[in-house]
Amino acid sequence: GDEIQVRGGGVGLSAADYEEVTIMNTSPRFLKAMNLSERAGKLRIPVAKIILGKIMGSGVGSGNCHRGSLDIQATSPEMVKEYSLDTIRLGDVVAVTDYDATYGARWQPGAITLGVVTHGSSYASGHGPGINVIMTSPSGVIEPIITRKANISEILNLP
């Protein structure tokens, strides 16, 4: 049979001083490049946009956020306008409030989940721009800091 070799970087990553933060689907190189900081017991992380958990769609209730994407519902033109969803770009790092992805995707007041936008919008009900989770905290110890430079291409200096 054929032989393959799989190399993984970042599998099992954790934030030493933040036990309630789960890191997934990312690499040590990307985390270092994100310029994380700490203040008042919170892990401050640059994000391009903050999304309300109540507008999340496809993926809610999934049992595993280590694969697949979670969609921001964008089928309603009114919702797109109200939440400026048309400004989301591929590669943006976004924060989802009141949303925990530690052991699957679920609504939880006070939780924060971070993800990278990996696909565009959709006309299918409950779908829209999709994010792959990179970090989550059920206790909200993550503090998102808005900056338009929070995009994977800027963070990693990609052409």
What are these regions (language model features)?
Residues 1-159:
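Conserved mixed alpha/beta catalytic, RNA-binding, or beta-rich assembly cores of soluble enzyme
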